Amino acid sequence: MRELAPGVHVLGGTKGGHVRSFLFEANGELTLVDTLFENDGAGVLDAIRKLGRQPGDLKRIVITHAHRSHLGGLAALKRATGATVLAHEWEADIVSGNRPAQSVGLKPTAPYRTYPFQVGIFLNRPKHRPVPIDESIGDGDDAGPLQVLHVPGHSPGHLAFFLPEHRLLLSGDAIATWPRFEAGWPAFTLNPDQHADSLRRMAALDAAIVGVGHGDPITENAADRVHGLV
């Protein structure tokens, strides 16, 4: 765990394409954005305790999108904390187990990048443990201290979040810095045209810090770098 800005902490390591989760302290409450993998819940709880807090202080868990590396730890964390679970309504049916995630298919745009991940997921995938969504959120809503942006493209219900006081953007998988800096993972983006529109919208925020779904956060020249993706 590292502090990205006052009251903003980054969790995650090298697993799952260097997937990241973000823990916010605000108004005496904790908000978690994404939950890492199925067996990462204990690590998130340890991070909460290292802040001098208790699991019950986690009031809300917000999901950027319903892909395994971002919601895997949700069931364990919901059980341990009782936190309210929030996601976009399109993703809610996947999180709750009523519908499978939409696939890039057997003929993805970048097969040599996609197939190894698909094989790895197939060989190592535990069964998704469904968790009902407590509240659907969308564009213009608030999730604790965060402003919600609907940024479809990578998935239809993909959300990003903005913390105005630090000009901090959480892009989810709309932007990645691992294995390279790029507009998300193109091989896994379902609608490139929507994704391009979403990138333009995020670039207009002129964020000073960008926390991404996979890879290290962008802390220098963040606004210029995001504009360069548009």
Language model feature labels by segment:
Residues A47, G73, S198-R201, L229:
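A general structural detector for well-ordered alpha-helical segments in enzyme core domains, enriched
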Residues T31-V33, V62, V85, L168-L170, ...:
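Residue-level marker for buried hydrophobic side chains located in beta-strands
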Residues E3, L36-N39, A92-P152, L190, Q194-A207, ...:
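Metallo-beta-lactamase
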Residues L58, G82-E89, P108, L170-G172, ...:
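Short hydrophobic/aromatic-enriched beta-strand-loop microsegments
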Residues G41-A87, E91, I209:
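Active-site metal-binding motif and surrounding structural segment of the metallo-beta-lactamase
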